[in-house]
Amino acid sequence: MTTLADLRINYSRASLDEADAAPDPFVQFDRWFKEALAAKLPEPNTMTVATVGADGRPSARILLIKAVDERGFVFFTNYESRKGHDLAANPHAALLFYWIELERQVRIEGRIEKTSTDESDRYFASRPLGSRIGAWASEQSTVIDSRATLEAREKEVAARYGENPPRPPHWGGYRLVPDAIEFWQGRPSRLHDRLLYTRDDAAATGWSISRLAP
């Protein structure tokens, strides 16, 4: 049997140098994201979202990024879920994008704010009908009796709202406003390239760049 200690690959696809990195981390993220799209990676918009609750316990889950601009990184969820309760108690989070085919990671840390009602309404209206019904049917992160209970609730919601379910008051968007963004490029011998962007009001771009030891 193969042991876990024997599982490894050597990274050699690319490098990341300060001279080639964009001065603005949002520009650098856009560059890498477009390269992930061009490489036809499966769901390059998936990310891990890590939160910490009032009890100090961390939790993490996979979500989809839905918008990125100079204000931050936007995702949508149930405000009454575990992550929602965590963020209400501690409005800070970390995101991680992992594009293994490109041997890249992007780590993002910052404070969390809710998106506007209009932003949440517009995105909710753009979702497939089944997803909009599901937002009402699922009391996310609560214990349920069975799959049948969930499906019965789905049918009930579909009958009530038809083709136009409104956005539930417990569902909407969050924006992570970053204060640190790290770009990681795998390199041979585990001597990876790591460039960390941190907020810096004195810098022309509002960000400073540091190289971290792997």
Curated annotation (Swiss-Prot):
UniProt-annotated binding residues for FMN: 61-66, 76-77, 82-83, 105, 140-141, 184, 194
Source species, domain of life: Bacteria
GO biological process: pyridoxine biosynthetic process
Residues the entry annotates as binding substrate: 8-11, 66, 123, 127, 131, 190-192
InterPro entries registered for this protein in UniProt: Pyridox_Oxase, Pyridox_Oxase_CS, Pyridox_Oxase_N, Pyridoxamine_oxidase_dimer_C, Split_barrel_FMN-bd
A molecular-function term among this protein's GO annotations: FMN binding
Protein's pathway: Cofactor metabolism; pyridoxal 5'-phosphate salvage; pyridoxal 5'-phosphate from pyridoxamine 5'-phosphate: step 1/1; Cofactor metabolism; pyridoxal 5'-phosphate salvage; pyridoxal 5'-phosphate from pyridoxine 5'-phosphate: step 1/1
EC number(s) on file: 1.4.3.5
Cofactor: FMN
Cofactor note: Binds 1 FMN per subunit.
Chemical reaction(s) catalysed: pyridoxamine 5'-phosphate + O2 + H2O = pyridoxal 5'-phosphate + H2O2 + NH4(+); pyridoxine 5'-phosphate + O2 = pyridoxal 5'-phosphate + H2O2
Keywords of the record: Flavoprotein, FMN, Oxidoreductase, Pyridoxine biosynthesis
PROSITE patterns xref list: PYRIDOX_OXIDASE
PANTHER family: PYRIDOXINE-5'-PHOSPHATE OXIDASE, PYRIDOXINE-5-PHOSPHATE OXIDASE
Functional note: Catalyzes the oxidation of either pyridoxine 5'-phosphate (PNP) or pyridoxamine 5'-phosphate (PMP) into pyridoxal 5'-phosphate (PLP).
Membership in a protein family: Belongs to the pyridoxamine 5'-phosphate oxidase family.
Known partners and oligomeric status: Homodimer.
NCBIfam families, A to Z: pdxH, PRK05679.1
Protein name: Pyridoxine/pyridoxamine 5'-phosphate oxidase
Organism: Burkholderia vietnamiensis (strain G4 / LMG 22486) (Burkholderia cepacia (strain R1808))
Lineage: Bacteria, Pseudomonadati, Pseudomonadota, Betaproteobacteria, Burkholderiales
Gene name of the encoded protein: pdxH
